[in-house]
Regions:
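Membrane-proximal basic amphipathic "stem/tether" segments
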Residues: 1-19, 311-373
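Short internal loop-to-helix segment that lines adenine-nucleotide cofactor pockets
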Residues: 3-21, 109-179, 192-199
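SAM cofactor-binding core of SAM-dependent methyltransferases
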Residues: 6-92, 96-102, 107-115, 120, ...
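Short Gly/charged-rich anion-binding patches and loops
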Residues: 55, 141, 203
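Short, solvent-exposed helix-helix connector turns and helix-capping sites enriched
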Residues: 66, 284-286, 334, 362
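Short hydrophobic/aromatic-enriched beta-strand-loop microsegments
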Residues: 68-74, 180-184, 302-305
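Short, charge-rich amphipathic alpha-helical segments embedded
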Residues: 287, 291-324
Length: 373
């Protein structure tokens, strides 16, 4: 999932003050593991990972040290009698699919001809999960599974299964409100047809808005055709430096700062509101997190020092201010300081600083993993 940050002072503070299992993450398509950046929450985090890859789930279970993180080896899907499933009957799985022409697919085919088996990393990056040993084909409707497991509240739902993402999203049509889900990350594709059942970005966006969510982050990845392959971005076949926009990751959340959903917000606990702020912070939207904290200060203040939380968000904004109050005073009294610059030296310095913070945050996360009991 694109968009998460390595360094997040708000999550570090929350980890110190939290009750266990106060944040519920559900990761559908968890091959590669639960993103380590969520683990900054410490004991606040409780997570369920779901994936059909038998060997990958066995690997994740064997290496998992946190008893609050569990894994289910299964295909997530939608009930056959669900209205969306009925509507999709007889329609192609992928309309206008460009994948067979992409250099990523051709690369893997060439490796096969050389009798070289794709690694797990290559399968994940090039969406070759079909070549893995998979769970029984029986579908698990995830909202039903969560109910049977005694999970009555979910804070963040991630869906990335390289195909049936939109179907799985529809299986949550009632559960989005019943589970009080605060944020959703889902892989979207920008190719496809104009069919309302096609899992294209425009259909996902329409569905999410109809259920009270707004788009807060969107990444797009490029894939080149085999007619003129571009260099791969990473050390495994996948996205390329050039090419057509292909898939991306969209992050939706409850826009409780807008005032449009005050009735929904009135039913939320302080923990749910704080979890929404945490979602914004980890997706590098400290401004949206600050909006939640300031609007619902009274609801959240019983869980921790809201001013300390705001100071952490100001630090994430990286303005050089010593505190949230100083940051706001600067904007009030010297707004011109917030204007951008085209000076290449200034831009280079900012880029280096950003890169250093990203590197340092990753080192901190890796160190925590090594020291975990």
């Amino acid at each position: 999932m694109d968009g998460l940050v390595n360094s997040c002072p708000l999550l570090d503070y929350i980890a110190k003050i939290s009750a266990p299992d106060a944040f519920q993450l559900v990761d559908i398509g968890c091959s590669g593991g639960i993103d380590r950046r969520w683990r900054r929450m410490g004991r606040r985090l409780r997570a369920v990972g779901i994936d059909p890859d038998v060997e990958e789930i066995a690997r994740l279970r064997a290496q998992e040290k946190n008893p609050a993180v569990s894994y289910l080896n299964a295909f997530a899907g939608i009930g056959a009698d669900h209205p969306f499933a009925v509507m999709r009957q007889g329609k192609p799985e992928f309309a206008r699919d460009p994948n067979p022409r992409m250099s990523t697919v051709q690369y893997v085919e060439r490796m096969k001809r050389k009798d070289r088996t794709a690694t797990g990393k290559e399968k994940r990056s090039s969406n070759l999960w079909q070549s893995a040993r998979l769970a029984d084909s029986e579908i698990v409707v995830v909202p039903d599974y969560l109910l049977s497991a005694g999970i009555a509240s979910v804070d963040f739902l991630k869906i990335d299964v390289d195909g049936k993402d939109f179907e799985i999203l529809h299986s949550f049509d009632q559960a989005l409100n019943e589970l009080q889900i605060m944020g959703i990350g889902i892989e979207v594709r920008v190719w496809g047809s104009d069919e309302e059942t096609d899992g294209t970005f425009h259909n996902v966006d329409r569905f999410m808005k109809a259920h009270g969510f707004e788009l807060f982050n969107l990444s797009l990845r490029r894939y080149s055709t085999a007619a003129l392959p571009s260099r791969f971005v990473g050390r495994a076949p996948g996205a390329t430096e050039r090419g057509r926009v292909h898939p991306g990751d969209a992050m939706y959340a409850r826009d409780l700062g807008s005032g449009m959903y005050d009735g929904f917000a009135d039913r939320l606990s302080g923990d749910k509101l704080l979890n929404l702020a945490a979602i914004f912070a980890i997706f590098d939207s400290p401004d949206c997190a600050a909006e939640v904290l300031t609007k619902y200060r009274e609801n959240i203040s019983g869980l921790g020092d809201v001013d300390t939380m705001l100071d952490g968000l100001a630090a994430q904004e990286n303005s050089g201010a010593a505190s949230y109050r100083e940051h706001m005073d600067r904007f009030e009294n010297a707004p011109a300081e917030f204007l951008g610059s085209k000076n290449p030296l200034v831009l280079a310095a900012r880029g280096l600083k950003h890169g250093y913070r990203k590197w340092r945050g990753r080192r901190e996360l890796l160190k925590r993993e090594r020291l975990a009991p």
